[in-house]
Amino acid sequence: RDVERSRGLGDVYKRQHLHSFENHPFQVNDDEAMAELVESVKEEGILTALLVRPLGDGEYEIIAGHRRRHAAQLAGLKEVPVIIRNMDQDTAVRAMVDSNLQRPNILPSEKAFAYRMKMEAMNHQGTSGGISAKDIGKNANDSARQVYRYIRLTYLMNDLLNAVDRDVIGLQVGVELSYLTVPEQEMVEEVHESTGKYPSLEQAKKIRQHREEKTLTKEIVRLLVIGERKKKTTVTLKQDEIKKYFPPEYDEQKIRTVICQLLEEWSNQNH
């Protein structure tokens, strides 16, 4: 049978009918903690039932318990205890995020996408952004401002987001870089590949400023990251070199005006 009662934990369902939450933001890793959980499952079984919601046709979506389901698989269990709850999508998202935020050692990327999913769910349910950010932060000991910082990380390309997870890039640096377009973020990653360096917070702010001023180039990123200033070009012309091209009655102001006009015309033709 697919279903039977389980030691007061709820119903027991075959593992094959339990599916991961759609776009589940939390990783399930085969690490030391998972190995310990597998041993516990082998010795005592699953002590806390998985929370699931019905999808129809005897299939269920896991709200809480993805690590337990994976441990059961590694331990060779074909059935796991579940508690079934009917939930709409937004309620399910909120429950999924809240249950997983209790995990230890959550990566910035996991928290980022979890916060964004919960924020969107709460907004769908009519909660304003400011209130929802405060509520989300309260449950995870983060301020509303910090919640927004984490959500900004979801706009990073994978290479940069992974660098934040590895603590190679600081959280606030990631936030600054998240305002760049994908091609601009790719420039940052290409500079990292060639120099071995990511921008500091101060450098990231300057990169963002260039982006807002529409002056950002890969060379500017490189110069900022390696700490070099772009050299200014200085041209000095002697007075007699210039005056030979002008009538004797032209004073300094007239000469300056003509030179500027000629340079403007040249620039328009060559850029």
Give names to the regions the model predicted.
Residues 26-27, 70-155, 179:
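Amphipathic, charge-rich alpha-helical segments that serve as recognition/docking helices
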Residues 113-120, 144-268:
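Amphipathic alpha-helical extensions and coiled-coil-like segments
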Residues 1, 6-7, 11-85, 96-102:
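Short, charged/polar connector segments at secondary-structure boundaries
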Residues 45, 76, 141, 167-168:
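Glycine-centered loop/turn motif at secondary-structure junctions
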Residues 35, 66, 130-131, 157-158:
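Residue-level marker for well-ordered alpha-helical positions
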